[in-house]
Amino acid sequence: MKLIYSTVLAMAFAVPAFADSHSMGDADAGEKQFGKCKACHAIVDDAGEVIQRGGKVGPNLYNLVGRQAGSVEDFKYGKSIVEAGEGGLVWDQASLAEYLEDPTDFLRTTLDDSKARSKMSFKLRKGTEDVAAYLASVSPGAEGMEEAPKSE
């Protein structure tokens, strides 16, 4: 009986940890979803090779995962995203998926500032984990990075 109890208890603690470490999205599905992002964003590698042709309203999303928020040189970011980056926000798949769902709400929560705003008004309601996984796949600097610690 003790063995059964111990096994059930161990599983109760293991399942949530396993779910968290394996809850990343599907990069192939995210690449398809990225079509919604192309109106404003492109993905162009450091050598100038175009991975995804897109708009220039938003910053280039190459190597986004693992990068400090609001830090692409020569891009005019909004004040709140720059403040979040200066406060320690480094994009990982989890934070990026949360941001994509509601950028302004994410910044308000992250900065604990009800007046914080994102210049990105688009909200991706479904597939945020997939898009985050796709962006991680075009972020060579993020290899081995699953989830960055939350800044406090």
Regions found by a protein language model. Give the residues of each.
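Positively charged n-region of N-terminal signal peptides that target proteins for export
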Residues: 1-4
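Electrostatic cytochrome c docking/interface patches
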Residues: 15-34, 44-51, 57, 152
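C-type cytochrome heme c attachment motif
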Residues: 32-43, 59-63, 95-101, 118-121, ...
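N-terminal, post-signal-peptide region of Sec/Tat-exported proteins
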Residues: 48-73
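Axial heme c-ligation environment in periplasmic c-type cytochrome domains
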Residues: 48-52, 73-92, 101-128
